[in-house]
Amino acid sequence: MATRSLGVVISDDEPGYDLDLFCIPHHYAEDLEKVFIPHGLIMDRTERLARDVMKEMGGHHIVALCVLKGGYKFFADLLDYIKALNRNSDGSIPMTVDFIRLKSYCNDQSTGDIKVIGGDDLSTLTGKNVLIVEDIIDTGKTMQTLLSLVKEHNPKMVKVASLLVKRTPRSVGYKPDFVGFEIPDKFVVGYALDYNEYFRDLNHVCVISETGKAKYKA
């Protein structure tokens, strides 16, 4: 692993970790290939991202916008770290939260047909520093759609934090402002990332097996 502006870069030949080295729910034992990013590493990286966010955005009211459903764990943990920094700083700022749901996946493919559910009234974003928190950037089309929607409400600033960015030839070239990990073009689950709503209850980010894909296929 190496570190650069795109976060912790996980190489294409990263072997991951054997499942039996971690506590994995028994009902998923045959459905995963390996643990890709252990929970502890996720938390340590998230703590640093919180500091980076406050450094760039901490001078004005922040509205943290969570992209559901996959982003909720990263959102909650990132905000916990941000709140800790905020309450221990002489220059603390107010922070509010909002939620939006986007749907673009069926099975393991981004459909390109992006549905926005919720977020009908985002007028509260006007004049605010908006931090959009997402679980994963795949092609980037979903985030481009959301950014267009958010910018209609004239926020003062918009930044995007994504736990994961996938290296894929399908990418439109969009890169978020804050990145936890840059990963190979593999379908990952866990830490609230799902495959047809399954695997959100895993603590670690894992690579799904072909058995798992077949079992939970829509």
From Swiss-Prot:
Disulfide bonds: none annotated. It is an enzyme of class 2 (transferase). InterPro entries: HGPRT, Hxn_phspho_trans, PRibTrfase_dom, PRTase-like. The modification N-acetylalanine is found at residue 2. SUPFAM superfamilies: PRTase-like. Pathway: Purine metabolism; IMP biosynthesis via salvage pathway; IMP from hypoxanthine: step 1/1. One of its GO terms (cellular component) is cytoplasm. Its EC number is 2.4.2.8. Coiled coil: none annotated. Homotetramer. PANTHER family: HYPOXANTHINE-GUANINE PHOSPHORIBOSYLTRANSFERASE. This is Hypoxanthine-guanine phosphoribosyltransferase. It comes from Canis lupus familiaris. The lineage of its organism: Eukaryota, Metazoa, Chordata, Craniata, Vertebrata. The gene is HPRT1.
